[in-house]
A protein has these predicted regions:
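Active-/binding-site microenvironments in catalytic and ligand-binding cores
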Residues: 2-175
Length: 175
């Protein structure tokens, strides 16, 4: 999954001033060094709690920051030395294997979307990435993830846990 920068500007707090859509990107915009983060073992461990299947009920499977089954600030810190100008952060969560078949009538209940309960970047991870960019004086080209979104489902639910499209979606807001 890759979001265009004009998509990031759906929030007024965004640090990103680039308003281009993906069709306006040049080859230089979409190539660069890769910084690889693999969280698939942690995601698989969380899925194993429910026989390898995700549940939209966070009491059954939880891909939020508190469980570690998502991208954490420590993951970003662990690759900080590799973050250079124009780098791409590429995250493997293993979630792509859930994108199969036709889903239910309510698309939010498809296992891939899982009622906004899936791994991705939360506020702490995004904040750490921006901190490293600022400290090093670099700007990454972007984030790519094998998922519905680069933001975690927890992030999408907002700080109150009930507010989709509210104050969450931290990569979109802070990007």
């Amino acid at each position: 999954h890759l979001d265009s920068t004009d998509h990031y500007l759906n929030k007024n707090k965004s640090n990103n001033t680039d308003k281009r859509s993906v069709d306006e990107y040049t080859l230089r915009d979409i190539i660069g060094p890769i910084v690889y983060i693999n969280i698939s073992a942690r995601v698989a461990k969380e899925l194993a709690r429910n026989g390898g299947k995700p549940s939209p009920d966070t009491k059954v499977t939880n891909f939020g920051t508190s469980t570690g089954a998502t991208v954490l600030a420590s993951d970003i810190e662990n690759v900080a030395a590799n973050i250079v100008d124009r780098a791409w952060i590429v995250v493997h969560s293993g979630w792509d294997k859930l994108f199969v078949g036709k889903g239910p009538k309510n698309p939010f209940m498809h296992p891939y979307i899982n009622g906004l309960n899936y791994p991705g970047f939360g506020k702490d991870a995004v904040t750490k990435l921006i901190e490293i960019e600022n400290r090093k004086g670099v700007r990454i080209n972007g984030i790519v993830m094998d998922n519905l979104s680069i933001d975690s489902g927890e992030s999408g639910r907002g700080s109150d846990g009930k507010n989709p499209y509210g104050d969450g979606w931290y990569t979109h807001q802070l990007g």
